[in-house]
Amino acid sequence: MLLVTGGAGFIGSNLVAALNDVAVCDFLGSDGKWRNLAKRQLADVVPPTELSAWLEDRKLDAVIHMGAISETIATDGDLVIETNFRFSSRLLDWCTVHATPFIYVSSAATYGEGDQGFVDDASIDALKRLRPMNLYGWSKHLFDLLILERLAKRREYAAAIGGPEVLQRFRSKRIPQGLDDGCVSAPVR
């Protein structure tokens, strides 16, 4: 079974549509987001607040982590850091302990104004030079750095989770029925 966090959102639900034996971790809310999943066959739908308990004694083939507060105008720093950094860190810890491949979706918001360019250089030094312009970009940037620092400190980590790890950076501008400016990605080793 695969777990897709953020699987009820626009991009996540389209990914889920292409997968089999998948569980979704997301807040459905009251704005009709459930409709994105209504035509899908799902193994489960789990609220993020219940994920830790759900993961107990569970074996997953992989985790695709897309869940985040993605509004670039978000202002609640505590909520954004809890959701985008701390929750992500706990999920990465679980994947590490259970040798589960972890695919993480970052954001092009980590580039900031682009004074360092928009080319994916997965080195820690290159990431440390990036200056995100908003809280959302900064929260994703912190997690990008955490992953790369763990990989640098513990080379066996990549083998333990069945690598290669993949870092995807999506641009935040979306339109109904499609992305108008795509994504960039780089394998992280």
Residue ranges and their predicted role:
Residues M1-A62:
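N-terminal Rossmann/SDR dinucleotide-binding element
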Residues T5, C25, V63-G67, F102-A108, ...:
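SDR active-site strand-loop-helix element
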Residues N14, A18, W94, L146:
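Rossmann-fold NAD(P)-dependent oxidoreductase module
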Residues S30, T110-Y111, V166-R169:
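Conserved sequence/active-site signature of Rossmann-fold short-chain dehydrogenase/reductase
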Residues K39, P48-T83, G112:
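NAD(P)H-binding glycine-rich loop region in Rossmannoid oxidoreductase-like domains
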Residues E82, R86, R90, V97, ...:
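Catalytic helix-loop patch of NAD(P)-dependent Rossmann-fold dehydrogenases
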Residues H141, R154-R155, V166-G182, R189:
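Glycine/proline-rich active-site loop of Rossmann-fold NAD(P)-dependent oxidoreductases
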